[in-house]
Every structure is written in C-alpha cells, then in structure tokens.
C-alpha cells in the first residue's frame, strides 16, 4: 500500500507527539509527581512564548527543541559593585543586591559592574508543568527557573540552563525553589552560573527529588579565583525533604551542597569529582544521610564542624540500622584522593520512616554509571 504525503505527515506528527514528554518516573521524596501529565505537548518558538507557557494556569507538557537565549532581552545595568575576593581576572565580583556590598563587605574594593538583567531573576514556573528537552537541543541561556509561591507538581527534565552572568555573584540562580512541593529535577545540566546552580529556601519546598543531573562548576570567574565555582547547591528551606540521587557534581570549590534550615537530605549514589575546596557544609537544621556516593579528588568532603546531624554510612555493621527506617541497609561511600567523611548520628533517621525512599546501589555502580549518564541528553 502506498501512503500519500498528507497521511505520512499525520503519522509523523503522531509519532512525535507520542514520543514527547517525560521519560521514567521520580524516585524518592517526589515519587508520584506527574507534572503536566497527559496534556498535549506544546513547542514554544520564542522566549516570550516559553515564559507564557511556564507561567500560565494550565497543565502543560512544554518541549524545548532549541536554545532560548534571554541574553539582552531585558537590557543591562551598569552600577557600582564590590570585589570581596580581589580584582584578579579569575575572581568573581559582586552586584550590590539589596545593599549586600554595603552591609556585608564594607571594606571590599568598589568596582563597576555591568550585568544582563534577564539573568538576575528566573522564569516563574507554575503548578502542573513538565518542561522537557528534546535530545540535547533544549537549552535556556541567560535566565534560570523559579518554582515558587505555592507551585507544585513540576517536572524539569533533559534541559540545560547556562550562562547567567557568570562573572557576578548575585547574577542569577539556575533553579530556585521556595514555597513549593512535589518537584522533580532530572537529567538537567547547569553551567556558568553567577550564583547558585540550585537553591531551596527559605520557605518550605517540601518534597523534592533531584536526579541524574550534571552540575558543572567549570568557570572563568569564581569566588575562589581558581576556575572552580563556589556556589553549588544551597538547601536551607524551612521544611524540606530532598532526594539527591545519581548526580554528577563537578569542579566545585564549596557549598555543594550547603544544608541547613530544616532540611532532611538523602544523598545517594552521587559522584563528586574534582574540588578545590569542600563539598558538604552542614549547618543547624541540616539532617543528612549520605550513602553509596563517590568522592574523587575532594580534599575536604565536609567543611568544619557539623551543625546539624549526619550519617555517613561508615561500615556494614553500623549501616544495618538503616533497614529499620529506610527499608534497606545503607551502602558505604567510596573515596579516592579525598578527605575523611565519618559520622554516625542516628537520632534523625526516624524522619525517613514511612516516606518514599530512593533505592541505593553500591558506590561502585555510581562510579561507573554516573559520569556517563548524568545531565542533558543522557536519558
């Protein structure tokens, strides 16, 4: 039977529609998130259309097939900032956001800063959205995402967020959650970000899963003036449960993550590689269980004294307690050319009981799979 061109076109469109949308499902605390569900996929063609789709009240599956470059769309600002870490060419300088330079760095040299306005504040993402990239094509450049103000049931999958005023602290965050719930961030790549690659807080973000994502800290400008990004992952919400699984956290110099507020973090099967500083920073209110992770070339796995509570899954005997609260025996972490990471607080483990808990593999599985599977285009 010979198919005529109109019929072929219809079949192609149907195949495209059936293939579009979310791949797989969330593990861990955000298990059950559906995003835009079975809504007919939409394909924005302009930055304005993308902003509209993300910010309206409809359930949507939004498919990105190209780079959406926000650079220059909101103009630039030139003003006086400061240089707390010096004026060498590899050092970040700071925007005087909310008088930060004035109030917190009064002795830092003043410098002129010119930044792109679009990067400072991300795109608002409302409830019941799936934002999905096609192949390796879906990129948001020059602007991040904000899942805030009560937004819930959101999936961000297989996209890249890049180039948010990387020279400037306070130049923008890649992904912000604040007063949210049921959010799944999966196979996302972030690179060349001014401030945080991922930030939760200060209001509750409740149930969140971040999986299979690539936080790339390679930069021409950093607060440590060495090409390693300092502002990695900041988890300080007032009532948050965060699953961090299968992520590749690369070339950072600090705060990857910083955990505080009132945050229960399950860090499982992640791969930290190549840091010039520290990975974890745990303040009061941070409750961290770390298992099955790999730390390679991380000189300081944890910064200073733990202000909250930490269970590092130190050995098989100690790890048996996890079966009572997580339903499995915790997996030891693996280390190569890295600092020590050994603490076994157990009082907080009861907080995992009855929750949706991600499965855990041996660290050797993460070691072999995470670098090749994390990030955009690796579904």
UniProtKB/Swiss-Prot annotation:
Glycosylation sites per record: 128
EC number: 4.2.2.10
Highest taxon of the lineage: Eukaryota
Signal peptide (UniProt feature, chain positions): 1-19
Pfam families: Pectate_lyase_4
Catalytic activity: Eliminative cleavage of (1->4)-alpha-D-galacturonan methyl ester to give oligosaccharides with 4-deoxy-6-O-methyl-alpha-D-galact-4-enuronosyl groups at their non-reducing ends
MF-aspect GO terms: pectate lyase activity; pectin lyase activity
Example GO BP: pectin catabolic process
Cell location: Secreted
Principal location listed in the UniProt entry: secreted
Disulphide connectivity of cysteines: 82-101, 91-225, 322-330
GO cellular component: extracellular region
Active-site residues from the entry: 255
Keyword Lyase: yes
Similarity comment: family membership: Belongs to the polysaccharide lyase 1 family.
Function: Pectinolytic enzymes consist of four classes of enzymes: pectin lyase, polygalacturonase, pectin methylesterase and rhamnogalacturonase. Among pectinolytic enzymes, pectin lyase is the most important in depolymerization of pectin, since it cleaves internal glycosidic bonds of highly methylated pectins.
Annotated protein name in UniProt: Pectin lyase B
Source organism: Emericella nidulans (strain FGSC A4 / ATCC 38163 / CBS 112.46 / NRRL 194 / M139)
Taxonomic lineage from the root: Eukaryota, Fungi, Dikarya, Ascomycota, Pezizomycotina
Name of the gene encoding the protein in the UniProt record: pelB
């Amino acid at each position: 039977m010979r198919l005529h061109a109109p019929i072929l076109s219809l079949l192609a469109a149907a195949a495209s529609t059936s293939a579009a949308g979310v791949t797989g499902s969330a593990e861990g605390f955000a298990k059950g998130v559906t995003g835009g569900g079975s809504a007919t996929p939409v394909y924005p063609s302009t930055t304005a259309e993308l902003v509209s789709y993300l910010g309206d009240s409809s359930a949507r599956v939004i498919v990105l097939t190209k780079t959406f470059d926000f650079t220059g769309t909101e103009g630039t600002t030139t003003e006086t900032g400061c240089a707390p870490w010096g004026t060498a060419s590899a050092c970040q300088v700071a925007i005087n956001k909310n008088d930060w330079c004035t109030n917190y760095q009064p002795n830092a040299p003043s410098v002129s800063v010119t930044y792109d306005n679009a990067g400072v504040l991300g795109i608002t993402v409302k409830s019941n959205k799936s934002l999905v990239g096609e192949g390796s094509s879906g990129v948001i450049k020059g602007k991040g995402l904000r899942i805030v103000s009560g937004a819930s049931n959101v999936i961000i999958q297989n996209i890249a967020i890049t180039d948010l005023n990387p020279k400037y602290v306070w130049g923008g965050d890649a992904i912000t959650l604040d007063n949210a719930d049921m959010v799944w961030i999966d196979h996302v790549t972030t690179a060349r970000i001014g401030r945080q690659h991922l930030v939760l807080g200060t209001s509750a973000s409740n149930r969140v899963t971040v999986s299979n994502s690539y936080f790339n800290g390679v930069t021409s400008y950093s607060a440590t003036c060495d090409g390693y990004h300092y502002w990695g992952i900041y988890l300080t919400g007032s009532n948050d449960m965060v699953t961090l699984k299968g992520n590749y956290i690369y070339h950072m110099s600090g705060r990857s993550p910083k955990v505080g507020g009132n945050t229960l973090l399950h860090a499982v099967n992640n791969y930290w590689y190549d840091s010039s500083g520290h990975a974890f920073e745990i303040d009061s209110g941070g409750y961290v269980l770390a298992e099955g992770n790999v730390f390679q070339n991380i000189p300081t796995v944890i910064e200073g004294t733990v202000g909250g509570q930490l269970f590092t899954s130190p050995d098989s005997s100690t790890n048996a307690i996890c079966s009572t609260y997580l339903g499995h025996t915790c997996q030891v972490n693996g280390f190569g050319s890295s600092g020590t990471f050994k603490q076994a607080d157990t009082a907080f483990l009861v907080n995992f009981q009855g929750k949706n808990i991600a499965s855990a593999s041996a660290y050797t599985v993460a070691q072999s799979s995470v670098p090749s599977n994390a990030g955009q285009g690796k579904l």
